[in-house]
Amino acid sequence: IYESEEWKLKRFDAFCIESAVTEPCLSRDLVKEWGTLRDGEALATCSSRTSVLRQFALFLTSLGMEAYIPSNFYKAEKNVVHILSEAEIKAFFEAVDDCVPAIKATGFHRLVTEYKVIFRLIYCCGLRISEARKLYWKDVDLQYGTIHIYQSKGHKDRLIYMATDLTELLQAYAKVLRDKYHCLSDWVFPARETDKCLSVGTIDKKFRDFWALTPFAESCDKAPTVHCLRHAFVVKRMNLWMEEGVPLKEMLPFLSRYLGHQS
C-alpha cells in the first residue's frame, strides 16, 4: 500500500535518531511529537505522515511489541475538484499529442508514446492513476477489449470493458512497443528501466507539464490533477445518461462497481 511512501518511514527513522530514541518502543510522546503540525506544513501532509506511522504501529502490535496507535489526525479542508470541460480535455490531449522529446534517445520517444496512451486510458475508463500505471499485459485482453484490475483500493477486483476505439489504440500501442522500441516488458507502461512501471511522480509531473501548455492554464484558479480525468469520465457518463433519458438512480450502482467504489 505504501510503496510510494517509503521515504516517510525513512524520515521517521531519521527523526528517531535526531530525537536520540534508545528504547525499542513506539511511545505516545514520540508519536505525538512526530504528528505535530509543523510551520508551513499542510494539514493533509501532516495527516499523511501520521497515517503511515499508524500502520507501522499496527504492524508492531501484531508482532507483540509495544506501540502507541495514533487515531486523531488533522483533518484537511476538502479541496474543490476541478471538473474538466470538453474544451479543456481536448486542449490537454492536443498538448500531449504535440509533444516531441527534446532528447533523441529511443527511450524518451517511447515514454512520450506511453503518455499519450496512459492518459487516454485513465480518462476513457475512469481508472485511478495507480490502477493504470500498475497494469500488466497479462491482465489486458486485447482480443475482447477487457482489463482485469486486481487488489485495487479496498482490496477489490473488477473487470473493465473498453470501447472499441480504445481497444484498437491499445493493440496498436502494444505493436509499437514490441516492433519499434523492442520493449518486451511485462508492464503496460514501463519506466525508463523497463523492469519497473511508471511512477506516480512521473505521471503527475507530465500531466502538469501538458496542462501548462493549454490555453486554460493561466486562467484556471485551481489547477487540475491526473485524478480529474477520472472525475471527467464520471461526469461525461452521467451527462450522457441524462441526455438519453436513462434514470441515474438505476445506473449509479453499476457505475460505482465499474469505478471500484465500495458503495
Predicted regions and their residues:
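Conserved catalytic core of the tyrosine transesterase superfamily
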Residues: 1-263
